[in-house]
UniProtKB/Swiss-Prot annotation:
Its main location: secreted. Residues 1-17 form the signal peptide. One of its GO terms (cellular component) is extracellular region. It comes from Saccharomyces cerevisiae (strain ATCC 204508 / S288c). InterPro entries: CSS2_C (IPR046624). Glycans are attached at residues 25-26, 53, 77, 163. N-glycosylated. Keywords: Glycoprotein, Secreted, Signal. The gene is CSS2. This is Secreted protein CSS2. The keyword Glycoprotein applies. It holds the Pfam family DUF6736. The keyword Electron transport does not apply. It is found in: Secreted.
Length: 232
């Protein structure tokens, strides 16, 4: 039986519009004239902040304390936020300033100002985590799609628990197809790779629009991760 106190999956996505070189262990491709910026989320989570009694998850006030320095890129309509789609390092204090905004929405902009509301951080995302963890623990290898509160999600299970053929058939070329379908308009859509301590893995797309259900990504081309695993 899975326990809430043994996993953590969070996402925080901010549009970045000023250049900073990515570390060598990340492979990304900047967006072109269609306004697509490659999504990379990589951050360290302090799972010790999780409730030990396994009954409570977290409140919005807890979120900044869980984040350490990380790299954040997102799918973005760069015509709204500027044409520079390079990444930037955003430290936890900058994220705190953004998250502490009354409407809890923000983009990291030049000068670390939270001046452009881009994504409402939905804590209902954690309810989706519950659903996915439950289904994967029961050996469900099907693609999962649904909606929770302010956002839509789509989840593709991968190895070691699920046959890689399922993963390849559902994700292969999906990003390109969706990009053509939406004419480059991927505003408010984000991609994650989930790794729960090696017990199960999956790729997850979340967004504010129902188009999320029809989008996918090639993980080999868009690297980044959120650890949702156990701690020693």
């Amino acid at each position: 039986m899975w326990c809430y106190s043994h996993f953590l999956l969070i996402f925080v996505s901010f549009v970045t519009s000023f250049a900073h070189k990515l570390p060598a262990n990340n492979s990304t491709t900047n967006g072109g004239t269609d306004g697509i910026a490659v999504p990379v989320i990589e951050t360290t989570i302090d799972s010790g902040m999780y409730s030990e009694n396994g009954t409570d998850l977290m409140t919005p006030e807890d979120l900044p304390d869980l984040l350490s320095d990380g790299i954040v890129l997102s799918f973005a309509n760069t015509t709204e936020t500027g044409s520079d789609s390079d990444s930037t390092l955003i430290d936890s204090e900058d994220l705190r300033r953004c998250i502490d905004m009354p409407d809890r929405s923000c983009s990291a902009q030049r000068g670390n100002l939270c001046s452009y509301s881009f994504w409402d951080i939905p804590f209902s995302f954690l309810n989706t985590v519950h659903d996915i963890f439950g289904m994967t623990n029961m050996g469900n290898c099907a693609v999962m799609a649904g909606d929770k509160g302010a956002f839509y999600y789509k989840y593709y299970p991968v190895e070691p628990n699920c046959n890689s053929t399922i993963h390849q058939k559902t994700i292969d070329d999906a990003l390109q197809q969706a990009t053509e379908q939406l004419n480059g308009d991927f505003n408010n859509m984000y991609f994650f790779h989930v790794n729960r301590g090696g017990l199960w893995q999956g790729d997850m797309m979340v967004g504010t629009r129902v188009f999320t259900w029809f989008a996918g990504a090639k993980w080999a081309e868009h690297k980044g991760s959120i650890e949702a695993g156990f701690t020693s």
